[in-house]
Design a protein with these regions (language model features):
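Adenosine-cofactor binding site in Rossmann-like domains, unifying the SAM/SAH pocket
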Residues: 1-20
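SDR active-site strand-loop-helix element
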Residues: 4, 29-35, 72-78
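NAD(P)H-binding glycine-rich loop region in Rossmannoid oxidoreductase-like domains
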Residues: 15-54
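Conserved beta-loop-beta element that borders a ligand/cofactor-binding pocket
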Residues: 76-77, 116-130
Length: 130
């Protein structure tokens, strides 16, 4: 296992993300990277939450696009499920209703990363678990 933090790799920088992956040659990447915040931050910096989280996930996926042997576990979040989802939440409720308004930009970025991962699986044969 080769842990990596934001101090090791700037995931906003595609070249640095690629370099880290090439240098470490991982068999598996567990993507838990995200810009997160509380209710105040989520409401105040809505654009930053969606843009920054999209950049992080796009860079990780672009960095592995030419390396289909690298497996990726792309972690989601409870916020990707509808506001009125039953508790305990069932996977079948994904994309069946309105998201919690305070964190919908973050949730949409996570949902986009799931769809991007599915696209890489279908088009390039990557082994990605969302």
């Amino acid at each position: 296992m080769i842990p990596s933090s934001k101090d090791d790799t700037d995931l906003f920088d595609l070249n640095q993300t690629r370099e880290t992956i090439l240098e470490t040659s991982p068999d598996l990447i567990i993507n838990a990277a995200a810009k997160v915040g509380g209710i105040l931050a989520n409401n105040t910096y809505r654009a930053e939450f969606i843009l920054d989280n999209l950049k992080i996930n796009i860079n990780i996926l672009e960095a592995i696009i030419d390396n289909p042997q690298i497996k990726l576990i792309n972690l989601g979040s409870s916020c990707i499920y509808p506001l009125n989802a039953s508790i305990p939440t069932k996977e079948e409720s994904f994309m069946t209703g309105k998201l919690e308004p305070t964190n919908s930009p973050y949730a949409m970025a996570k949902i986009a990363s799931i769809e991007m991962g599915n696209a890489l699986k279908m088009q390039y044969g990557h082994k990605i678990i969302n």
